[in-house]
Amino acid sequence: MKILVDENMPYADQLFQQLGDVQAIPGRPVPEGVLDHADAFMVRSVTKVNEELLKGRAVKFIGTATAGTDHVDQSWLSQAGIGFSAAPGCNAIAVVEYVFSALMLLAERDNFELKDKVVGIVGVGNVGSRLAERLAVLGIRTLLCDPPRADRGDAGEFWSLEKLVKEADILTFHTPLNKSGPYKTHHLVDVELLSVLPDNRILINASRGEVIDNQALLTALKCGKKLRVVLDVWEPEPDLSLPLLELVDIGTPHIAGYTLEGKARGTTQVFEAYCEFLGQPRKVALSDLLPEPDFSRVTLHGNVTQSTLKRLMHLVYDVRRDDTPLRQVAGQKGQFDYLRKNYLERREWSSLTVCCDNRESAELLAALGFSTELI
């Protein structure tokens, strides 16, 4: 059995070699001829999986080690009798921690307290729901917008996007990309929405680039619209708009979900799904794969303040480490993908144990996702 895996899937060799011969390949572009005799192909979001890629091939299973699936033509796979699995929620914690890292940086730059802001979350799936939970731990008011969940009658109060725009100080987008239908998210942020969005708001997109009309956003910023903007995703990728990058406050190369833990979850989820597909069910413990972090313990005395939180969060991950390299190489052919392919190891807050002399601090940090000990 021949199994192809994206070269940026950690632990793929270690896991999939239990099932057959494994070959790691670039996801964009897919090398000519490699699919000719493959039985399965494990991809990430850079690979467009469709009839053009797979017609006439022997591939019987596609796994994407990502939560998003808009790069996969699932309808065609089903018609062709090809098995498919994604990894929902695998990088949700990573994206939440990316958003916090960005917000802490902006709060320091603009001298505001997050607890005084209202956060509007658009898309309350794996990422949005976890973000809401962690904001609630800090006593920060959140407004939720998720039309599909609202129409299903899910528990909770859901706001329309129109009302959210008027009420929220911070708008953060965590939707899938739907190009049509009743829940279309393509260009959810367009000329019209930007025209009614009050000045001095924070706009964050860590979902899919096309959720925001990048040209409309560029025009608004050029015309003096006063916004703080954080973009991890772009329209298009990898050839993002250089003028837009120059005007946003934080710009990164689609890496919000790129923690080692998140990538490992994605790999293990598609591995387990492929094992099920083969009729050989297996389970993998993430803790058996992950290495000890280089820096794993810190001591905290006293209560947790926003300044303390910023230091702890940025000790694990400071978003500036990804903003600066992108600005240095943007516009150079292949560099967007190079930054993603050669991404420096990044861990999640849970990799850091905070030793506290205060039970209240330990409980708060644990609720946020840090590992804690009382001293």
Swiss-Prot record:
It is found in: Cytoplasm. NAD(+) binds at residues 146, 175, 206-208, 232, 257. Its main location: cytoplasm. Substrate binds at residues 45, 66, 258. It comes from the Bacteria. GO terms for biological process: 'de novo' pyridoxal 5'-phosphate biosynthetic process; pyridoxine biosynthetic process. It catalyses: 4-phospho-D-erythronate + NAD(+) = (R)-3-hydroxy-2-oxo-4-phosphooxybutanoate + NADH + H(+). The keyword Transmembrane helix does not apply. GO terms for molecular function: 4-phosphoerythronate dehydrogenase activity; NAD binding; protein dimerization activity. Keywords: Cytoplasm, NAD, Oxidoreductase, Pyridoxine biosynthesis. It is an enzyme of class 1 (oxidoreductase). It holds the Pfam family DUF3410. Homodimer. Catalyzes the oxidation of erythronate-4-phosphate to 3-hydroxy-2-oxo-4-phosphonooxybutanoate. This is Erythronate-4-phosphate dehydrogenase. It comes from Photorhabdus laumondii subsp. laumondii (strain DSM 15139 / CIP 105565 / TT01). The gene is pdxB.
